[in-house]
Amino acid sequence: MTRIAIVGVAGRMGRTLVNAVQQDPEASLGGGIVEPGSSLVGADLGELAGVGRLGVNATDDPAAIADAFDVLIDFTAPRVTLANLAFCAEHGKAIVIGTTGLSDDELAELDGYRERVPMVFAPNMSVGVNLTLKLLETAARALGDEGYDIEVSEAHHRHKVDAPSGTALKMGEVVAKALSRDLKEDGVFERVGQCGPRGDKEIGFATVRAGDIVGEHTVMFATEGERIEITHKASSRMTFAKGAVRAARWVASRGNGRYDMQDVLGLKG
């Protein structure tokens, strides 16, 4: 049984994670963490999540529940995540990170913990999205540089704060790597006004923020006479939550290192 604690337990994703842990027979809820000074300190996590009283209360101090969990799940903000990563290194805990929007410096800081913490870091925990990444790699290798224009589009709810989504960027990185390209050089994130014709090696990105869209991603390979589109659509946050719990169970028995969902699902190699 893997004991799991959830950071940001009062948020939309946090409440969904509580539900996912309760549904998993191989996991148990060890605790939930809210913002320092939150009025929700002491609240029952089951009541917060709408699943009934569980007898596990929210805290704003991870150290207070350090003996109650094995793995921390964090879908919050970059600086919060890095602070929790340091906590896990100090207390011998594993961590699953679904936070997106990290800067290059923050990613480097995160990577510096790979020898100190067992961590799964992935922009998207959905099994379907991670299978989609494998499909994209296969498609890009097969098509090669045969005149296919590549465009990545994504849509999310109006509350999402980073753009493009971490999943869209990961899709672009997978395609770029398969084509021996560098996304930092070939990625195009804005086209405005007289921007000129499309470059041959461009990987374009388009973003939509509207309503309550959970998450939709499409990668288009377009050439003269045909267009291939590979799409993933999420209709519920539960798909991400279940993937995160699966990752937590997996990483609980792993040594220090930085892993991703491809490792969890056995899709590498």
Swiss-Prot record:
The active site is at H156 (proton donor/acceptor), K160 (proton donor). It catalyses: (S)-2,3,4,5-tetrahydrodipicolinate + NAD(+) + H2O = (2S,4S)-4-hydroxy-2,3,4,5-tetrahydrodipicolinate + NADH + H(+); (S)-2,3,4,5-tetrahydrodipicolinate + NADP(+) + H2O = (2S,4S)-4-hydroxy-2,3,4,5-tetrahydrodipicolinate + NADPH + H(+). It is found in: Cytoplasm. NAD(+) binds at G8, V9, A10, G11, R12, M13, G98, T99, T100, A122, P123, N124, M125. One of its GO terms (cellular component) is cytosol. Keywords: Amino-acid biosynthesis, Cytoplasm, Diaminopimelate biosynthesis, Lysine biosynthesis, NAD, NADP, Oxidoreductase. The keyword Cytoplasm applies. (S)-2,3,4,5-tetrahydrodipicolinate binds at H157, G166, T167. One of its GO terms (biological process) is lysine biosynthetic process via diaminopimelate. Pathway: Amino-acid biosynthesis; L-lysine biosynthesis via DAP pathway; (S)-tetrahydrodipicolinate from L-aspartate: step 4/4. InterPro entries: DapB_C, DapB_N, DapB_N_CS, DHDPR_bac, NAD(P)-bd_dom_sf. It is an enzyme of class 1 (oxidoreductase). GO terms for molecular function: 4-hydroxy-tetrahydrodipicolinate reductase; NAD binding; NADP binding; oxidoreductase activity, acting on CH or CH2 groups, NAD or NADP as acceptor. Its EC number is 1.17.1.8. PROSITE patterns: DAPB (PS01298). Belongs to the DapB family. Catalyzes the conversion of 4-hydroxy-tetrahydrodipicolinate (HTPA) to tetrahydrodipicolinate. This is 4-hydroxy-tetrahydrodipicolinate reductase. It comes from Chromohalobacter salexigens (strain ATCC BAA-138 / DSM 3043 / CIP 106854 / NCIMB 13768 / 1H11).
